[in-house]
């Protein structure tokens, strides 16, 4: 499901959720809300803060050290620079919903 399909899902399937406060949510409002959440998570991660959404999961930064790698085509050694890797770890409610 891509972002557009998810926004449509949020507006069309809100009535199936007994706790749905978004029963009258328009697609424009749903898109604004989703964009705000995404931008907020990105901003927090850029600021080196972990984001924990209880039940859903957590977004974290893991620092990867500089290391030596190989070019798979030529086999030549090359340096892979250090970088920060964003990661997501699913929460209990999300894991339970999948099983």
UniProtKB/Swiss-Prot annotation:
User: In this record, what's one Pfam family?
Assistant: Bac_DNA_binding
Concerning Gene3D superfamilies, the annotation shows: IHF-like DNA-binding proteins (4.10.520.10)
Q: Which family does it belong to?
A: Belongs to the bacterial histone-like protein family.
In Gene Ontology terms, what is one molecular function of this protein?
structural constituent of chromatin
Under the heading PANTHER family, the entry gives:
DNA-BINDING PROTEIN HU, DNA-BINDING PROTEIN HU-BETA
Q: Which organism is it from?
A: Rickettsia prowazekii (strain Madrid E)
* Single GO biological process annotation from the record: chromosome condensation
Q: What is this protein called?
A: DNA-binding protein HU
Q: Lineage from the top down?
A: Bacteria, Pseudomonadati, Pseudomonadota, Alphaproteobacteria, Rickettsiales
> What stretches pass through the bilayer?
none
Q: Does the keyword Hydrolase apply?
A: no
Functional description taken from the UniProt entry: Histone-like DNA-binding protein which is capable of wrapping DNA to stabilize it, and thus to prevent its denaturation under extreme environmental conditions.
Q: Which UniProt keywords apply?
A: DNA condensation, DNA-binding
SUPFAM superfamilies named in the record? IHF-like DNA-binding proteins (SSF47729)
Q: What SMART domains is this protein classified in? A: BHL
Source superkingdom: Bacteria
Q: Does the keyword Cell inner membrane apply?
A: no
Known partners and oligomeric status: Homodimer.
Residue ranges, annotated region (Disordered): 63-82
């Amino acid at each position: 499901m891509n972002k557009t399909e998810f926004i449509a899902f949020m507006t069309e399937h809100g009535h199936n959720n007994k706790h749905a406060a978004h029963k009258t949510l328009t697609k424009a409002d749903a898109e604004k809300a989703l964009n705000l959440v995404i931008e907020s998570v990105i901003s927090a991660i850029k600021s080196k803060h972990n984001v924990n959404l209880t039940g859903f999961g957590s977004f974290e930064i893991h620092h990867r050290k500089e290391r030596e790698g190989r070019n798979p085509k030529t086999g030549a050694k090359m340096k892979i620079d250090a970088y920060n890797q964003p990661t997501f770890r699913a929460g209990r409610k999300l894991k339970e919903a999948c099983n």
